[in-house]
Amino acid sequence: MWAQLSYTRPESQKTDLTSLFSTDQEQNPLNDYQYQINIRELEEYYNKTILNEDNIQETSSEISSAVSFSPPKNTNAIQPGLLYDPQLMNPFLPSAHLNSTAPTTFKKKLEVQINPDYVPKSSQLPLTSQNLQQLSQQKPKNDASFSSEKESSAQPKVKSQVQETPKQLYKTELCESFTLKGSCPYGSKCQFAHGLGELKVKKSCKNFRTKPCVNWEKLGYCPYGRRCCFKHGDDNDIAVYVKAGTYCNVSSTSKQSDEKRSNGRGSAKKKNLNVKVKALQRMTW
């Protein structure tokens, strides 16, 4: 007679699936309040770690249904697959049912193509061989364009300066420093002629110096020199102009008066014909 064998597994080898919410009614009973607290903790954990922009719509419906659902008191466990599903814990992991080509496609999507023709807006470029070659090619072109712009901008300025100078002004005297030293600190801004090319002889006029210079009479010299508006020397120097023929309207009376003045200058003091005699006498030359 064959007897039926009964095999009992020891308690240490039992693999009863339990979850965080599974309780033993005799040792650790779980009430509704504690159950709701565990649900809220689980929901906060999902919101902080797992949920993202891509799977918000998929998991929101599950979370709302889990929160609104009130399980009966007799239920002792929840399906462990929902808690230990690696796809829910980390949504970036590839699923098991995908083909072997999934990792390659996943990597290709993350790859970024670099545009070799990209030029940044800033003028500072990285020091690479390609950038150095481009800069060396651009420099001669930029220098040629810059020099042409300089020439074009300088020409109108010269023309405007020539047009601004009036035609009535001209240089009638040579520059002393230029004629003696060969250089002038004023350069082109000098008011005197640098060489015979810039010198223009003034037309002769009939205006002569008739009043004697006070500095010439008292000191024997005048700091103004030839630019002085008064006469230096005796009245006999007017005869030079008369002989040259530039001053022909000299009357006999004026000649006689000039001779009398020249003869009587040594004996008698000449009268000052100015009105403010006292003011002139106080001046010290």
Curated annotation (Swiss-Prot):
Disulfide bond sites: none
InterPro entries for the chain: ZFP36-like, Znf_CCCH, Znf_CCCH_sf
Zn-finger region bounds: C3H1-type: 169-197, 207-235
Pfam families linked to this entry: zf-CCCH
Positions of region (Required for mRNA decay activity): 37-55
GO biological process: one example: electron transport coupled proton transport
UniProt KW Nucleotidyltransferase keyword: no
GO molecular-function term, one example from the UniProt record: mRNA binding
The UniProt record lists the keyword Nucleotidyltransferase: no
Biased composition (Polar residues): 153-164
UniProtKB keywords: Cytoplasm, Metal-binding, Nucleus, Repeat, RNA-binding, Zinc, Zinc-finger
Stretches for region Disordered: 132-164, 252-271
PANTHER family noted in UniProt: CCCH ZINC FINGER/TIS11-RELATED, PROTEIN TIS11
Function, as annotated: Binds to specific AU-rich elements (ARE) in the 3'-untranslated region of target mRNAs and promotes their degradation. In response to iron deficiency, promotes the decay of many mRNAs encoding proteins involved in iron-dependent pathways. Recruits the DHH1 helicase to the SDH4 mRNA and promotes SDH4 mRNA decay. Also destabilizes target mRNA by modulating 3'-end processing, creating extended transcripts that are prone for degradation.
Assembly information from the UniProt record: Interacts with DHH1.
Protein name: mRNA decay factor CTH2
